[in-house]
Amino acid sequence: MNGASRGDVQRPTPVQAPAKRPIPPTVFRFEKASKIGTSLDTTPKELPIRRPVPLPGPRFVKDVNPSPPATSSPNVQTQCHQPPVVRSQTHQASVSQTTPTQTTPSQYTPASVSTARAPQFHRSSHVTPSQQQRIEQAFGPAPVSQSQPQNGSYIQYNEPSTSVASTTTSFYSPNESEPVFTHAISFKPNEPENGQKAREQLELLDSGKINEINQSKVPTTIELPPNCKLFQYSWVLDGIPRTLLVPMPMDATEEDVKAMLPKTLEMDSNLFNNARPRDELPVLSFPNGTVPNVEMIGPKVQQPMLVNPKQFNRIMRRREMRQQLEASGRLPLARQKYLHESRHLHALKRKRGLDGRFDNTKTAESSSMVSSTTSPRKLKRRNRLPGEETSDSSSIVLPSPVEIQPKGGIVNSSMPSTSTGYINNGMDHQTDYIEHQQPMSTYDQYHDHVQYIAPDGNVNYHNNHDNGVDLTGSDGQSFTNL
């Protein structure tokens, strides 16, 4: 099935690429890479190569209020990580004497700091006691280290190294006797606290303004009698919103409030603000911890309904479609009051409960009362049977032939009839039936021959012995089965 019946498939011959000629060795040129060139090629352009500079060990303390920066600033290598450490004057002199002797080349290259961006300050020759106290409060007392440097490029201290600037005498200019710093931290005097600032600002204000500010911060307290409610009236006078709270009895109305207010106020129902939250009301004090009812007068302000953009676009789309249908006449301009008027009328007639819902129990009770008041019409029956005592055979009242069922038994008087319409309207037009009926003295005579006049005027006879099953009782009564 998979192509085996067709035979072997002829495979194409693979195409072989022509052999390529080897590349002659004269094309390549080998050059010996120098060490300097390799370092230059591998070094990024953003990091220029710096020659190692000896890092001596003296550390200097800057002035709190430094002098103006120097005009000429040499290229200084610095490294700052922590605030400067205070040193005594004698210790600085001893360190400065040993600095020139340590000029051995170092293997450590510190980071270069540009002197164009950083401020440059001179070292102060003297530190005042107040400045020393401020420095100790800010950074704590600095321990003095007695360790000597082991190498010219590495200086070891027991405490953390926080050198602000590191220079050598070779970088000094001829006319300068003090080193130049590229980094400095200024100590500002302690600023007054927030409370002190507030007091200074309040001292500048007038005493009358201070009283107004204090009075505005005191909450308003209103004492109300029990069993009362508040009416809130808001209006704007000269651009200033004003609010009036009127306490009234529990049964008071809007008309009573209008009568209480002065006539100068323009009473408008729209001025009664019913949308103001209770949080904005002044603080109220009620007797016995009770809270009166607050009744807002006027129509409720309809708040806008917030929808998302998708719902908004859909709403606008439906409005456009409705306008198009109304313009074309396919949609009536006035909507129908009820979709089915008959259902509405039926709903009005139904009984409802206290909550407005339909009450099915009341409907069932009303229907049962109607059925009990209209009792069905009972069937007429014979007074006596032939075997029973009878006073006068001529007084037997025979029922109408429609009510007599020759094939059935005795009808129970307590059983309601289900064919009232047939009884009332079945043989009403036969008014001459009783006149043509002949009296019978015995039941057998009546049972053998039942005679009645049909609507067409013919006399019909029915023989009851041939139909049904004989149900003769012990007393000789004969009945027929239904």
From Swiss-Prot:
Keywords: DNA-binding, Nucleus, Repressor, Transcription, Transcription regulation
Cell location: Nucleus
UniProt keyword annotation of Transferase present: no
Start-end of Low complexity biased regions: 94-110, 363-375
Annotated gene: nfya-1
Protein name: Nuclear transcription factor Y subunit nfya-1
Bias (Basic and acidic residues): 353-362
Region (Disordered): 1-160, 344-414
Primary residence: nucleus
Polar residues bias (residue ranges): 72-93, 126-135, 144-160
GO molecular function term, any single one: DNA-binding transcription repressor activity
Motif Subunit association domain (SAD) positions after renumbering to this chain: 306-329
Consequence of gene disruption: RNAi-mediated knockdown results in ectopic expression of the homeobox protein egl-5 in the head region of hermaphrodites. RNAi-mediated knockdown results in morphological defects in the male tail due to cell transformation defects whereby anterior seam cells adopt a posterior seam cell fate, which is indicated by ectopic expression of the ray-specific protein pkd-2 in the anterior mid-body region. This leads to impaired cell identities of the rays derived from seam cells. These animals also have defective cell transformations in the ventral cord and generate two extra serotonergic CP neurons.
One biological process term in Gene Ontology: negative regulation of transcription by RNA polymerase II
Superkingdom of this protein's organism: Eukaryota
Tissues and organs where the protein is expressed, per its UniProt entry: Expressed in certain parts of the gonads with high expression in fertilized oocytes in the uterus and mature oocytes from the distal to the proximal arm of the gonad, but weak expression in the syncytial ovaries and immature oocytes at the beginning of the proximal arm of the gonad. Highly expressed in the head ganglia neurons and the developing hermaphrodite vulva and male tail. Weakly expressed in most somatic cells.
Residue ranges of DNA binding: 336-361
Function, as annotated: Component of the sequence-specific heterotrimeric transcription factor (nfya-1-NF-Y) which specifically recognizes a 5'-CCAAT-3' box motif found in the promoters of its target genes to regulate their expression and control cellular identity in particular tissue types. In association with the components in the nfya-1-NF-Y complex, represses the expression of the T-box transcription factor tbx-2 throughout larval development, which most likely restricts its expression to certain tissues. May act to repress txb-2 expression in conjunction with tbx-2 itself, which has an autoregulatory role.
Family note: Belongs to the NFYA/HAP2 subunit family.
Pfam families: CBFB_NFYA
Keyword Transmembrane helix: no
GO cellular component: CCAAT-binding factor complex; nucleus
